[in-house]
């Protein structure tokens, strides 16, 4: 591997050539920048590579940044930009201008028109950087999008469609997972993952790599079981019933603990397969009680468990532990136990970022983790030189016997420094430690600002003011990372910013990040750590005797470079353990990643396909083979097909009726028979869908297949997660847990594919039958307009006077005989016949509603009025009705009026058939009218 020195020498020469173009770039007019961008794009289309055009592109971007921001990039910033384009991590000290550095590779790679993602650790930084750098990109003619958690899908799609998109790491990963859950390809928001630049790369790619991104859905809750597991954990004694590994923070039941578990839950064997769920609950309860601390890993607020980012101290809103650990913590803290979630989609940051064609990153400290960057991400860490020499003084640690002694000395030093006016930044490792220090500072009447998981809203504002005279800022870990602490006027003369770290962090780079807040751009400064034997790191990595000797110091301390080196070595050991843990997570996730890629790729194929017959055909073969296996029995050590049983299951249901006889199953290999059955399945399936519109079929097929994929992939994730949580027990049987996991996870994946195929074949069969049935019903109740009736009458030659069952059936019988060989015409005629017969039924129904024993005569009067003719009620005849009706039809062009007349005519014909009754009723009506005029509105008939 090429050394940093040689690379920096090479990149330095390139940077010099970029700077040499400055006079030429100064001649550009503002409108020339867009023309330059178009010219660069054309060069790439003509076959030039990014490296071929890098020097001129960076020179143009440098001039654009100078004009817009008033900042002329230093040589070291150009070197950083070259490192980023090469797909590596640029380690740049605090204050060296990482935001400006990112402009150059972003612009260069945006010219490919494939998209560039600039990733930050929070939305404040994304918004800030997109607003600042967006002005430069606007001059260059490059579009910029800002992604955020509050955006709609349409807004996200718009943001990702831009040349450059600013986004947070979490939102980027969740968008990827959500994109692979959509039911329509057009609903995706991201393009193909091309190139990303990750700000604070160590935080994103290492610190957060241990926590996978998970999208969860609700499932049934088990409140009583969680409470029982919590009560059991409370009944255990730390040394008698448990083995606790402080170094790795793992908790295990020892032999006595296992015995207690069996007694508590009335079990014979905790490790029996049927007790997997109980075992899982117990392990979560043990973690919650003995490995997780309130104020360190989580905090409780408003009856809710909120996760704390271990490396920034920020609350991770919207995040929760999976696999029941969140519920175990809720039981421990006696808050409401939420519904347990099931994982719908998951990915680790490690595997997500490896999906990009090229990744790069910037950070202040990453060299200590270079091995991990190379092994996992295939990226080097190259340290860029500072623009000015670092003159900050890094003092040896002050080591105390107790936390109280350390904090008393801290307060003394803060008081002394504060009296001189120099600003102070106090860094802590947890919210708990932050609150403890705050109490000491308040007791000493020192005014200070605090940033931790419980108070982070004003984070950037507080950090920005931390360099003012007399400022005291208390910050959890690397809160405010990404915001420079600029020294106020006169602070340099006071010795610059003092950084006091309370307790060493798990990783050296986090300590280095804290130190690096002081001494930016050649400013003076000082850093010092106050550590004690009560610190987590010391408890885990020092012997009890050593801790006891330090306790004897009382309030005194040791300031020794040798002991500082010993602490650094302990950190190295812990870094190695954490790397192993992350590598272990990755080893297991790699199996899931391969399976995820297969599922997501197949899902995309299904979303984009216009014809899914090949997919269905393969699934039918799988389903057919499984049916054969299911209906086979073991005879003399061999599985023999139960032919009769198999035939009964498939005949007329999955394959055409009488397609197979029992003899057809003789002397055939199972796979050959499965292919034959699958072909018959497809034959029946195609016959059933032949009359359904093609777009309806493809939509239905796509939905059924995607639903099956999502249903069984979710189940697979759940089972694989539970498998992984207990796989470590295999080591007690002298087995390799990872090898066993690979074997079992692969078997689970194959079973999942079989379940998907079975589900799709069964559901397609059921749904198609329902669609055909619904289609038939739909045709029966088809909505018909007046225009439809006119067209049918015209096409069939029926007269309006022929709207009765006999005439309609006679005419359509003639037409069906005539067109008996035309399948499409016959189908149309059958629909038309049903429409006309349905019309007759409707007319009869309306006639029954109109005609009643009490108002027949008034109905006739109203209907005659409807026909607009004077007819003597007493002598009305069928012939008169037809004659008047036909006369009226010739005069009317309005379909609605024609409809009214058809109904009126039909009603009159029915009434005439009962003429004798009507005449008798007329006499009765006249008698009634003498007594009282009939004014009942219900007797007035409104036709239509």
Curated annotation (Swiss-Prot):
GO annotation, cellular component aspect: cell envelope Sec protein transport complex; cytosol; plasma membrane
Record region (Disordered): 920-944
Q: Does the keyword Translocase apply?
A: yes
- State the Gene Ontology terms under molecular function: ATP binding; protein-exporting ATPase activity
Tell me its EC number(s), please.
Answer: 7.4.2.8
Subcellular location per UniProt equals:
Cell membrane; Cytoplasm
- Membrane topology (UniProt): Peripheral membrane protein
Task: Supply the Pfam families for this chain.
Answer: P-loop_SecA, SecA_DEAD, SecA_PP_bind, SecA_SW
Q: What does this protein do?
A: Part of the Sec protein translocase complex. Interacts with the SecYEG preprotein conducting channel. Has a central role in coupling the hydrolysis of ATP to the transfer of proteins into and across the cell membrane, serving as an ATP-driven molecular motor driving the stepwise translocation of polypeptide chains across the membrane.
Name of the featured protein: Protein translocase subunit SecA
